[in-house]
Structure formats: structure tokens, C-alpha cells
């Protein structure tokens, strides 16, 4: 029995003919906007109906428990605390669920690679909260209704922002996630310019913590 899985590690690169097409999604590679993290996953194999599909949110770390279940390994034999959940129940008719140790899903980008600077997103149910560390800004979207992320609900729903931010802070602390910190000696004029002639950000990441499990 052979299963074939097709997936991408991130969204569109955002420029050039070979960078991919992100359609109406915001952002691109190097961000946690939907254009940077949303990409299709295709699985073909025994027992999977042709032309079946679902909109369940999945992530790369779901593959390990999926492989184990296909191989007949009982789920209670897997290491405690793994973040992923098996996708097998989704493959029959697309109506199953993925059981993970946490209901929320986090994408963490503690770098200055993009104009947004270090930022993180947390998903819970239909909501997505984005946190931008340099500006202190939050953005809240109902992804089920606004996949293009055009209607920021943060001002309308401050309690939801606070609740999701609390979950986010707890998660990043639990996994000892890498965070960006100010470097007072950084001179942006000494940073090599990019292809558009722009210099680097005013503050450069100076890591003092080892990388955790948050990912983008």
C-alpha cells in the first residue's frame, strides 16, 4: 500500500514568474499572513475517494502521527506531548477531525526578513490573531468568513484579542520559542541593500533564546 503526499512548506514567494500565485490571499513567504502559510495538501492512496476534499486546517507536524496510524501503531503508543494529530479520519470523506494536544495552532516568525518584522499568528476555531512585536499592534480576523484578511476585528472584539494573546504567550513560553530582541549597536546603513535598494530594519534580531517549536 502506497500513499503519495504533495505539500508545500510555505506560501507564495510574492514576486516573479516562478514564485507561485497566491490569488486574493494577503502576504507571502516570510510572513504569517495567509499568503505566507496557506498552501494545499494533496494525499492519494488506498481508501481515499477520488475528488474528495476538505477545508480542515492541517500542518506538517500532523504527518508523523498520520504515518504511525497507517503503519498500525496505536495512537496511545506515540510519545507524550507531540503537537500533531493524525489526518486519517479526514481521508474517508473529509468530515473527520484532527485530535491534537492543543486546540490552538501557532505560526511564529521571530525575524526581520519582511516589512512586518517579527510577528506571530495563533488560530483557534474560526479566528486568527496576529501579533506584531515592533509596533505592538494586533490584527484579528474571522478566517472562515474573511480568508483575504481584509476586515480587522481587533477593535470590535478586544476580549477575543486578549484571550488569544494570553494563549499565544503561554504557548511561546512553554516551547521556549526564539524571540527577537533589540540590538542597540545595529546600524541599518551598514546592512547590504536588497534588490530594491532598501536597507535593513532599524533593529536587528539578536537571539538570546534557542529556537522552540513555534514555526512558520
Where do the model's predicted regions map?
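Loop/turn elements at helix/coil->beta-strand transitions in domains of secreted/extracellular proteins
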Residues: 1-4, 39, 101-102, 124-127, ...
Amino acid at each position: 500500500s502506497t500513499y503519495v503526499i504533495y505539500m508545500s512548506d510555505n506560501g507564495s514567494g510574492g514576486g516573479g514568474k516562478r514564485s507561485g500565485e497566491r490569488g486574493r490571499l494577503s502576504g507571502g513567504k516570510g510572513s504569517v499572513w495567509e499568503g505566507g502559510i496557506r498552501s494545499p495538501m494533496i494525499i492519494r492512496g488506498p481508501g481515499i475517494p477520488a475528488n474528495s476534499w476538505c477545508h480542515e486546517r492541517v500542518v506538517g507536524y500532523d504527518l508523523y502521527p498520520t504515518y504511525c496510524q497507517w503503519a498500525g501503531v496505536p495512537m496511545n503508543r506515540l510519545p507524550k506531548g507531540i503537537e500533531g494529530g493524525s489526518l486519517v479520519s479526514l481521508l474517508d470523506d473529509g468530515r473527520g477531525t484532527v485530535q491534537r494536544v492543543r486546540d490552538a495552532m501557532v505560526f511564529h516568525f521571530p525575524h526581520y526578513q519582511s516589512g512586518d518584522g517579527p510577528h506571530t499568528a495563533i488560530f483557534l476555531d474560526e479566528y486568527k490573531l496576529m501579533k506584531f512585536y515592533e509596533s505592538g499592534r494586533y490584527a484579528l480576523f474571522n478566517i472562515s468568513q474573511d480568508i483575504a484578511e481584509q476586515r480587522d476585528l481587533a477593535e470590535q472584539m478586544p476580549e477575543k484579542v486578549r484571550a488569544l494573546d494570553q494563549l499565544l504567550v503561554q504557548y511561546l513560553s512553554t516551547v521556549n520559542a526564539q524571540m527577537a530582541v533589540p540590538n542597540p549597536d545595529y546600524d541599518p546603513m551598514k546592512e547590504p541593500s536588497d534588490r530594491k535598494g532598501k536597507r535593513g530594519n532599524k533593529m536587528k534580531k539578536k537571539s538570546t533564546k534557542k529556537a522552540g517549536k513555534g514555526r512558520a
